[in-house]
């Protein structure tokens, strides 16, 4: 019966994969793939632990005591589903379940193994005792003892024992104790009068020393972490973890910083079938350097609200706040990689979607600005608008008689978070701004698109037409007076209309082809493709300078935006006029055997049939006519070119350029070289240049093509020095500012046994005049935990191709050491 069932199951798999619409007893195939369905023919038979079959094997055997006692000799073994016993001689009593093993006795149970001179074990009661055991448990812990008692299936007690998480012979650390108890179900080991040895030297003693035997959650003190930064000094943290329930836990972390004082941090995580989230925060009652309280709070929440009228409703919330703009810069060790954030998001969103064509959301979004208020390059008008609230409804239907139809309507109330406390503290205390520096208002937007994609082998063509309609209701705060001569809040045109409307048709035609031919590259056969693309766009001109600008900015010109409808992104406050065509050409060289791309060349450029007339300006009225005239002289966009080459399987290079054809000067340049010769080995070189964009707002009306933009070079890598030591580093240098913007240097150690250690130094710019330094030191001991602050997120985000030298732990199987 077993063979027949196994054969039937093996035959079932290819049959179902061959016929996608076939209905079977085991599953139902549909357009979404095969999904399993319950069947009464298949039943899971539970194993009775008290009535298990016993198998024996040996070279010779003898039966005594009315066939109830079996004596096995020569490679003897007794097997049950939950335990295996081996030895040179085994006596097995079938009535009592007692097994006595002599000579190289071994017990293998649930992936753990115990070897001793002799052992007694009851296969029914799961109890026993072993003399001079040497053991290895499933989680990787090893040790030895004078005597061991198997109290039950989850409890092992040992006398005069040694325990270590290092499985190699030369153990870095171990615990020595007159009595060690290991509780597998509680993930806990307890050593009475235990002494911790490192490199054979006793470093810590405790009358009740606890340790975890598996990498699972357990209530207790975690190992302390340490940090060193230039702004906070030496930091010390001692976390306490409280495992409230399998789906709830709390971590409390008292901390001390030598330049700041004491801080208390906490984190609460929760998980339920319909919702989950995390709440964390810190509080410092009095910063000894600034003499004021410092705090932070972060909350994320996701929740399923259920189904109504065929729609699934959900709720998301994100809230982040800090006591001041310098919090993350001062406490970068608390929130690594957040020191350069400029805005903290505070939002709550009610969303819905379902099996029909409609989806939407209602959200409220606010911000906390972390700009350096003393930096002249961060004026108050760089603060973002808040959306309080925003309501959006979207409908999508594809392949509707060959047509793709989408429509979206959004209503947003914009409020600028500029209040008197900002201006009088950071701008000019002599000015009275009436609490407003920018206009507030409501924007109504509707955009419906209809396209008819025609896709055939080797070519496609997609005509599309859309209608955009928007209406603005704006409060320019004309009721306020400005006694100190402050200019009025005005639009780009200098007007202050309360209501503005705009309706624009948008038409485009996107088409492309793909040609292939056989060729060679680097002396090997390749398939070369030639992929021309033409994108025509027409949008009539509408005067828009009297419309406020809430969330719209100029997009970066690249291969993605070259084929887009609007050169402005973020919102719909400006829609460019267009009578233009974008021409693009891509050629690829593909490996014939694997399809891997060995080389690719891309070029693209826009050509304007009519000169652009819509521009993005500021709120203050400025004369941008001269800038506009110079810009309007251009009949084509910048020329885009990019080439990527896989010189070998481990060496890749990429070069990109953006040429301003108006004056034949580079607007942007990018070049990179990346080499990954083997595991834990990488090297990357990068050069970036970006010229300053056109100056179309501000009081200094200069139109310059000087090479004074951003110009940076970066080198990063990970390199093995020996089989145990690895160097990591990165250096970013600004050629324009003539200074380092980031430096990282570190050394990693991994002994392939139980120890991983890292020391990393990082220095990075937090503004044009300020930098921060930090030192990360971490030591990880298998089975004991980690000491120090974790720099892995810094290394992963900063070094392309970085690999953790510590092999990730895999889930252990009970058959890990099956014999």
Would you name each region that the model predicts?
Residues 21-160, 174-182, 187-193, 252, ...:
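N-terminal amphipathic/hydrophobic interface segments
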Residues 18, 63, 816-819:
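Short, intrinsically disordered, low-complexity terminal/loop segments
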Residues 7, 25-26, 808:
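N-terminal compositionally biased, intrinsically disordered segments and leader/signal-like regions
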Residues 7, 20-21, 233, 245:
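Immediate N-terminus of the mature polypeptide
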Residues 115-127, 135-157, 161-163, 168-176, ...:
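Outer-membrane beta-barrel proteins and related beta-barrel translocases across Gram-negative bacteria
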Residues 2-19:
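Gram-negative bacterial Sec-dependent N-terminal signal peptides
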Residues 10-11, 58-60, 509:
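Short, Lys/Arg-rich amphipathic segments at extreme N-termini
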């Amino acid at each position: 019966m077993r063979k027949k069932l196994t054969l039937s199951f093996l035959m079932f798999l290819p049959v179902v994969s061959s016929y996608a619409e076939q209905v079977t007893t085991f599953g139902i195939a549909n357009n979404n793939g095969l999904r399993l369905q319950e069947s009464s023919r298949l039943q899971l038979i539970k194993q009775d632990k008290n009535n298990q079959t016993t198998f024996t094997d040996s070279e010779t055997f003898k039966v005594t005591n009315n066939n109830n006692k079996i004596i096995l000799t020569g490679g003897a073994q007794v097997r049950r589903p939950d335990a295996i016993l081996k030895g040179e001689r085994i006596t097995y009593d079938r009535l009592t379940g007692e097994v006595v093993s002599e000579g190289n006795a071994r017990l293998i149970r649930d992936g753990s193994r115990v070897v001793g001179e002799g052992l007694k074990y009851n296969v029914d009661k799961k109890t026993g005792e072993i003399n001079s055991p040497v053991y290895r448990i499933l989680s990787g812990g090893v040790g030895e003892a004078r005597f061991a008692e198997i109290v039950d299936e989850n409890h092992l007690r040992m006398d005069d024992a040694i325990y270590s998480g290092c499985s190699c012979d030369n153990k870095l650390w171990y615990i020595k104790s007159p009595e060690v108890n290991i509780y597998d179900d509680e993930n806990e080991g307890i050593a009475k009068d235990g002494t911790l040895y490192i490199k054979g030297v006793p470093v810590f003693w405790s009358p009740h020393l606890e340790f975890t035997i598996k990498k699972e959650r357990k209530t207790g003190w975690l190992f302390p972490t340490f940090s060193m930064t230039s702004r906070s000094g030496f930091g010390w943290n001692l976390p306490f973890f409280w495992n409230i329930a399998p789906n709830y836990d709390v971590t409390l972390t008292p901390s001390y910083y030598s330049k700041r004082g004491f801080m208390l941090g906490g984190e609460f995580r929760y998980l339920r079938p319909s919702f989950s989230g995390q709440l964390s925060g810190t509080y410092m009652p009095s910063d000894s350097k600034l003499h004021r309280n410092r705090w932070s709070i972060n909350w994320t929440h996701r929740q399923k609200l259920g189904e109504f009228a065929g729609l699934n409703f959900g709720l998301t919330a994100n809230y982040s706040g800090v006591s001041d703009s310098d919090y993350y810069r001062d406490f970068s060790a608390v929130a690594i990689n957040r020191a350069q954030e400029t805005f903290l998001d505070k939002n709550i969103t009610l969303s819905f979607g379902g099996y029909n064509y409609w989806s939407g959301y209602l959200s409220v979004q606010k911000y906390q600005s972390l700009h350096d208020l003393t930096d002249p390059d961060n004026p108050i008008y760089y603060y973002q608008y808040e959306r309080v609230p925003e309501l959006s409804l979207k409908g999508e239907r594809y392949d509707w008689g060959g047509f793709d139809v989408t429509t979206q309507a959004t209503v947003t109330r914009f409020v600028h978070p500029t209040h008197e406390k900002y201006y009088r503290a950071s701008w000019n205390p002599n000015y009275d701004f009436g609490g407003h520096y920018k206009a507030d208002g409501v924007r109504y937007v509707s955009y419906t698109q209809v396209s008819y994609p025609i896709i055939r082998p080797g070519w496609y063509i997609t005509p599309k037409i859309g209608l955009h309609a928007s209406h603005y209701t704006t409060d320019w705060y004309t009721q306020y007076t400005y006694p100190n001569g402050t200019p009025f809040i005005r639009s780009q045109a200098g007007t202050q209309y309360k209501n503005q409307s705009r309706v624009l048709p948008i038409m485009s035609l996107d088409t492309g082809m793909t040609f292939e031919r056989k060729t060679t590259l680097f002396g090997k056969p390749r398939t070369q493709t030639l992929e021309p693309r033409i994108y025509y766009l027409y949008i009539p001109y509408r005067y828009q300078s009297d419309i406020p600008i809430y969330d719209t900015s100029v997009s970066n010109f690249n291969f993605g935006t070259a084929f887009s409808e609007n050169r402005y992104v973020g919102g719909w406050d400006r829609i460019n006029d267009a009578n233009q065509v974008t021409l693009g050409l891509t050629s690829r060289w593909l490996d014939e055997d694997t399809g891997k791309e060995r080389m690719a060349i891309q070029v693209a450029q826009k050509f304007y049939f009519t000169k652009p007339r819509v521009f993005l300006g500021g709120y203050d009225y400025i004369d941008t006519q001269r800038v506009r005239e110079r810009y309007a002289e251009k009949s084509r966009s910048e020329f885009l070119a990019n080439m990527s080459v896989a010189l070998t399987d481990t060496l890749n290079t990429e070069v990109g350029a953006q040429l301003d054809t108006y004056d034949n000067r580079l607007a942007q340049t990018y070049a990179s070289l990346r080499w990954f010769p083997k595991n834990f080995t990488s090297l990357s070189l990068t050069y970036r240049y970006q010229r300053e964009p056109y100056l179309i707002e501000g009081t200094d009306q200069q139109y310059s093509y000087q090479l004074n933009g951003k110009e940076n070079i970066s080198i990063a890598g990970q390199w093995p020095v020996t089989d145990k030591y690895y160097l990591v580093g990165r250096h970013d240098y600004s050629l324009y500012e003539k200074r380092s913007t980031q430096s990282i240097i570190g050394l990693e150690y991994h002994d392939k046994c139980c120890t991983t250690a890292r020391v990393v130094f990082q220095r990075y710019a937090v503004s044009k005049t300020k930098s921060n330094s930090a030192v990360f030191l971490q030591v990880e001991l298998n089975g004991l935990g980690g000491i120090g602050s974790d720099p892995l997120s810094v290394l992963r985000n900063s070094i392309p191709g970085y690999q953790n030298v510590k092999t990730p732990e895999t889930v252990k199987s009970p058959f890990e050491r099956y014999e």
